[in-house]
Curated annotation (Swiss-Prot):
Disulfide bonds: none annotated. This is Oxygen-dependent choline dehydrogenase. One of its GO terms (cellular component) is membrane. Keywords: FAD, Flavoprotein, NAD, Oxidoreductase. Its cofactor is FAD. The gene is betA.
Length: 559
């Protein structure tokens, strides 16, 4: 079969492109997805509070593992990636965070990326979004992505933890995606008004899947991209055990994410020549940056016992779960309708940082992100991690076999700045937790525990316990330097008819969760593919810290 466009990967970016390109009825699109449908009756992916479940199996999760990480006690660390219609938006934590305005302004200082400034990107964030409280200069009200804001009457620990951050001397913000990201405040989530996960399959594909010019093939594992010289002309893929090919008249659009996109490029003969020759892969184009510059967010949990019986601990007990499930299923309300990340914040840990370098997610229960190691008592925790680590990793294909996972090394914690930021983060978090707003709730420190105090003790805790925030990115970065893979429109350097459009093309990781920005990138490049005029630049005001101090004097100084 032949199509105008073939999209590889029905994830956060691929579904945006599929929906936008097929708005033109004379354009045909084939969307290939290695996973299955997003089964709407499967509570594991549809109930926000069940977000840990998809990470525990392989039905919706590629379940990659890293190579032994040399600065993390040689641990092989999780690298979960979504599999199925929706991609990682089908299994993520549903935090709707866009990044800091300064992230995009920094991108725009790079050669060839001048139109990626915050004010250039903001109209595309707005285009994608329907926020439940309506539109303003920063938010949309008619986009495919449903965004829900925290409501009065939610867990009181959210409010106490935000208040504690403010009492510790940090700013308060009423919108982490609005005028000012820096500070503590409520956190939006990608959840529908009926309490369902708002993946890009629900938001974008539901609008597009009935169109006759869109063909969606699930359980289609991409083998390689096909070339005629330097031009992409099709895709070879497996449907079960059957080898299939499809031809592309215009372009192949690679949207497989920061792990699989470089893997597919390399397997197709586009990447570092030495690696490809070592694996007996015919070199189509020597492009050394493919798979390099890999970045992620690392985070830790600081956990506390809760003296008041107000945490979500009872919701973890099996005998309470049928009632929670029924309320969610029939009413779309209650504990099940929230991801429980309803408060958080961004701060600068030192004056040398010109925009926030530390992120917080507050959670009114003590448990690991993947649902393991739940504390068997009332508790709460702060997830804290650095935002723009200087550590750089890589993704490398291991063989020609499409079913073999690649070699992944993030090289976490490879610089002294990493260690300084995480030590600072733990000590600052302890100051926040010691503020009067939490006196009523705060019991003993469960993890890391008050015995862990010196730099050496903190470092060992970090090495042993820090985990991925599941934000791999930047492995096919856009730009014009020698290690760039694509230009500012996603076109692969030195090739024709081939783009990469996903989190892998970020030149530097953003300050926050990646899903919203990945959707924005796809919306922006969709206009380029369609040769449309970009949306007019926003004129919204936004906060720049400048010489503003990192914090005011805390209400309760560190003891």
């Amino acid at each position: 079969m032949e199509y105008d466009y073939i999209i590889i990967g029905a994830g956060s970016a691929g579904n945006v492109l599929a929906a936008r390109l097929t708005e033109e009825s004379d354009v045909s699109v084939l969307l290939l997805e290695a996973g299955g449908p997003d089964y709407r009756l499967d509570f594991r992916t549809q109930m926000p509070a069940a977000l840990a479940f998809p990470l525990q199996g392989k039905r919706y999760n590629w379940a990659y593992e890293t190579d032994p990480e040399p600065h993390m006690n040689d641990r092989r660390m999780e690298c979960g990636r979504g599999k199925g219609l929706g991609g990682s938006s089908l299994i993520n934590g549903m935090c709707y965070i866009r990044g800091n305005a300064m992230d995009f302004d920094h991108w725009a200082t790079m050669s060839g990326l001048e139109d990626w400034s915050y004010l250039d990107c903001l109209p595309y964030f707005r285009k994608a979004e329907t926020r439940d409280v309506g539109a303003n200069d920063y938010h949309g009200a008619s986009g495919p992505v449903s965004v829900t804001t925290p409501k009065m009457g939610n867990n009181e620990l959210f409010h106490a933890m935000v208040e504690a951050g403010v009492q510790a001397g940090y700013p308060r913000t009423d919108d982490l995606n609005g005028y000012q990201q820096e500070g503590f405040g409520p956190m939006d989530r990608t959840v529908t008004p009926k309490g369902r996960r708002a993946s890009t399959a629900r938001g974008y594909l539901d609008q597009a899947k009935s169109r006759k010019n869109l063909t969606i093939v699930t359980h289609a594992l991409t083998d390689r991209i096909l070339f005629d010289g330097k031009r992409a002309v099709g895709v070879a893929y497996f449907k079960g055990e059957s080898a299939q090919t499809a031809k592309a008249r215009r372009e192949v659009l690679l949207c497989a994410g920061a792990i699989a996109s470089p893997q597919i490029l390399q397997r197709s003969g586009v990447g570092p020549k030495d690696l490809l020759q070592r694996l007996d892969i015919s070199v189509v184009h020597d492009l050394p940056g493919v798979g390099e510059n890999l970045q992620d967010h690392l985070e830790m949990y600081l956990q506390y016992a809760c003296k008041e019986p107000v945490s979500l601990y009872p919701a973890l007990q099996w005998f309470n779960q049928p009632k929670i499930g029924a309320e969610w299923l029939f009413n779309g309300t209650g504990i099940g309708a929230s991801n429980q990340f309803e408060a958080g914040g961004f701060i600068r840990s030192r004056d040398e940082f010109t925009w926030p370098n530390i992120q917080y997610h507050f959670l009114p229960v003590a448990i690991n992100y993947n649902g393991s190691n739940a504390v068997k008592e009332h508790g709460f925790q702060a997830h804290v991690g650095s935002m723009r680590s200087l550590s750089r990793g890589r993704v490398q294909v291991r063989s020609k076999d499409a079913r073999e996972h690649p070699s992944i090394l993030f090289n976490y914690m490879s610089t002294e700045q990493d260690w300084q930021e995480f030590r600072d983060a733990i000590r600052i978090t302890r100051e926040i937790m010691a503020q009067p707003a939490l006196d009523k709730y705060r019991g003993r420190e469960i993890s890391p525990g008050l015995a862990v105090q010196t730099d050496e003790e903190l470092d060992e805790f970090i090495r042993t316990h820090a985990e991925t925030a599941f934000h791999p990115s930047c492995s096919c970065k856009m730009g014009e330097d020698d290690m760039s893979v694509v230009d500012g429109q996603g076109c692969v350097h030195g090739m024709e008819g081939l783009r990469v459009v996903d989190a892998s093309i970020m030149p530097q990781i953003i300050t926050g969760n990646l899903n919203a920005t990945t959707i924005m990138i796809a919306e922006k490049i969709a206009d380029r593919i369609r040769r449309r005029q970009p949306l007019p630049r926003s004129k919204a005001r936004y906060y720049v810290a400048g010489s503003t101090p990192v914090r005011k004097a805390p209400l309760k100084p560190a003891s």
